[in-house]
């Protein structure tokens, strides 16, 4: 009860970030397209439920080469696991109304319609929420009435018109902040383009995740955040189990950018070359006869870590 009251008293903003480093070899748990799609959806759902802001696909050149050589499928994307994972992770995160514009039909998207939409943002709402006026949208075309104005489809009953000093190409995805006013004479709402992180930083609302890839040895060096990652959690189901009290004691007093590294045999060969605070823990209290699969490891880890990260993240 004491921890719940502490969490409820936290300010309604969130400047810290949580990233997940996922080895592309994790895709080995599934042996056909339908199961691979199911695996990616499960990862996407766990990531969205626990407010993870970034997914980093860790590449191992030897694994990629072996996959390309031994994959017999006619689908070229299955020969490139990084491309396959990136496409599906981004597809599941993208609002439904803009998927057709951003993702042309491809064989590897065949089974994506079998899975429910992720519980993200306010994508399903068709009206403006005055208390939280952010929306994801897609550029449709420049406004014919004014220079540097663009029409945005934000999944609402009215389009949104925004200003931009730089050129916005059609089908560009943007985050907009709607202004509190009625539609203009053309039936358009007015808004401003803001950063993807604005809803999280200003209002504390989880707004989805970004996806990037890098070599496993370049994980911390390639961080997109200023100052890089300052807290690294290596999740390894092969290490000794620790209690929740021991786990919380090992966390830093505060952090800005945490990265959770989901380990497997490939990643364990690479050293995380960083000065960041680093811990390694086994999310399971007991050992298993069979190794748990990646989504089980991630879910178990977030079950134990989520409240602790919430308490220690800088706001």
UniProtKB/Swiss-Prot annotation:
Q: Which UniProt keywords apply?
A: Cytoplasm, Methyltransferase, Nucleus, Transferase
**EC numbers:** 2.1.1.-
Cellular localisation = Cytoplasm; Nucleus
Q: Name one GO biological process term.
A: methylation
Enzyme class, first EC level, given as a word: transferase
State any GO CC term.
cytosol
Taxonomically, which superkingdom? Eukaryota
Recall the GO molecular function terms of this protein's record.
Answer: RNA methyltransferase activity
Q: Does the keyword Transferase apply?
A: yes
Gene3D superfamilies the record matches = 3.40.1280.10, Nucleic acid-binding proteins (2.40.50.140)
Pfam families for this protein: Methyltrn_RNA_3
Q: What is its main location?
A: cytoplasm
- Could you say which protein family the record assigns here? Belongs to the class IV-like SAM-binding methyltransferase superfamily.
Its protein name is Putative methyltransferase SPBC8D2.16c
Q: What is the lineage of its organism?
A: Eukaryota, Fungi, Dikarya, Ascomycota, Taphrinomycotina
